[in-house]
A protein has these predicted regions:
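Glycine-rich FAD pyrophosphate-binding loop
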Residues: 8-34
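Dinucleotide-binding Rossmann-like beta1-alpha1 core, especially the glycine-rich loop
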Residues: 35-111
């Protein structure tokens, strides 16, 4: 859609976009339900970037509602921050680590692997087997319908692990939702 907009508005070309689905927007499609609630049928799509140019370009087409996504995972009877951070580890294991000690702790539980090929490998090599089982294995199986050992490492490699208390899912400078939805 960006290419179509640029062709039309910069080069004066006529553009036709054909969407395979019966609505515009692809997976970012959203709609208001009968109660006025904005629904994302394909799951939430949170805009995030570190690029001021991209943010300014898109700001021509929408006003923004600032939004920083935070996730709590239900683990062992507790609601814990996800991505895994300092508070996650301290609360889950009853520790009192500092941010300086956190990386050493992660290194001590991480599995040393010669090759990281699967999503399981990617996670256990960063946070160890226990955290993998508590946070990643079941969720990844539910989301993808496959065991993480059957998925490429890139599937879970993008999920960060933080050594500080930052509990935002994304750390990008610009995080928001279009004020009136994507579509």
């Amino acid at each position: 859609s960006v290419l179509a907009e640029r062709l039309a508005n910069v080069l004066g070309q006529r553009v036709l976009i054909v969407d395979k689905r019966p609505h515009i927007g692809g997976n970012a499609y959203d709609r208001y339900d009968d109660h006025g609630v904005l629904v994302h049928p394909y799951g939430p799509h949170i805009f995030h970037t570190n690029s001021e140019d991209i943010f300014e370009y898109l700001s021509q087409f929408t006003d923004w509602r600032p939004y920083q996504h935070r996730v709590l995972a239900s683990v062992d009877g507790q609601l814990l921050p996800m991505p895994i951070n300092l508070d996650t580890i301290n609360r889950l294991y009853g520790l009192n680590l500092t941010s300086f000690e956190m990386q050493d702790w992660l290194d001590s539980v991480a599995e040393k692997l010669d090759r990281v090929e699967t999503s399981e490998d990617a996670v256990v090599s960063k946070v160890g087997r226990d955290l993998y089982n508590k946070f990643f294995r079941g969720y990844t199986r539910k989301q993808w319908g496959l065991d993480p050992s059957e998925l490429d490492a890139s599937v879970t490699a993008r999920v960060p692990t933080r050594t500080n208390r930052d509990d935002r899912y994304f750390a990008d400078t610009y995080q928001a939702l279009p004020k009136h939805g994507y579509t």
